[in-house]
Amino acid sequence: MSKIAFIYPGQGAQAVGMGEDFYEKSPLSRTIFDQASEAVNLDLKKLCFEENDLLDKTEYTQVAMVTACLAMTRAVESMGLHADMTAGLSLGEYCAIAVAGGMCDLDAIRTVRSRGIFMEHAAPEGSGAMSAVLGMDAAVIEDVLNGREGVSIANYNCPGQIVITGEAAAVAEAGTALKEAGARRVLPLKVSGPFHSPMMRPAGEELAKVFAGVSMNPLKIPYVANINAEVITDCGRIEGLLVDQVSGSVRWQQSVETMICEGVDTFVEIGPGKTLTGFLRKIDKNVKAYHIGSWEEAVQVCEELK
């Protein structure tokens, strides 16, 4: 029997206008935006729907993305489409957990508001960097990085796309070594910090304090965790996995492979952009991939999959 997974993009996919048509057409979406704005004391409609200078700043991006993606999802569910399993890339993992039932929507939104602030300020500006390594096998990258201080793998996105992270000088030196070892390209990324590196541990420590005031709920469906690509069914594990995720590697390719092994053959990416849909095609061409980033797409996908 066919299994459907809802998957959620991470930071970098944000776009002005995300969720606006859902806000206009779905009372559920409208309620999430309005309640979230009150909960975090930000005008999230203005942040998501209007041109502004804040949307690309980490401390605002994260809360905006999770609010928009959850608002879209609740509308999709009201149309009759539901997931058997969820996962999200980095920030998207919070959406995955909320949709799986592990956190209420507002707790997820409040938590990522804090997470964004902590990550924005965890490392001094300019001290860290991230680069995408294209056209090189993960095992070769691991060999090149082995023994190097200050640089590690942030994301295993898909075959031929790995992201490295860490101290700025160490990332630059590793990039040169990777090109010499045969990488097709090494692209420095425009980011505000060395995400998913040990330099983010202070953010993880602060995040752990926030989780002390958050209730985790029994999961209604399983989700797959970034840090270990394992199927999670025990809500008692959520907090530790999310704290570790801030400074650990995101094993996205492995997470998708886990879901496929669990019988998922249909993936629905919910949120702005089609980043994960692109990764899916490189991980396994045999699975069905859909994207919902607009009301029109939601109607079409729900009609096809219900």
Task: Map each language-model feature to its residues.
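Short, flexible helix/strand-to-coil boundary loops that buttress conserved ligand/catalytic motifs
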Residues: C48, L145, G175, L280, ...
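FabD-like malonyl-/acyl-CoA
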Residues: S2-V140, R185, L189, T266-E296
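Non-catalytic positions within long, well-ordered alpha-helices that form the structural scaffold/packing
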Residues: E77, K179, I260-G263
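A short, flexible low-complexity segment enriched in Lys/Arg and Gly/Pro that occurs
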Residues: A64-L70, Q245-W252
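Cys-dependent protein tyrosine phosphatase-like superfamily
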Residues: M1-A5, G213-N226, V231, G240, ...
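Alpha/beta catalytic cores of group-transfer enzymes, especially the acyltransferase/condensing modules
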Residues: Q11-A13, E38-V40, A100-S247
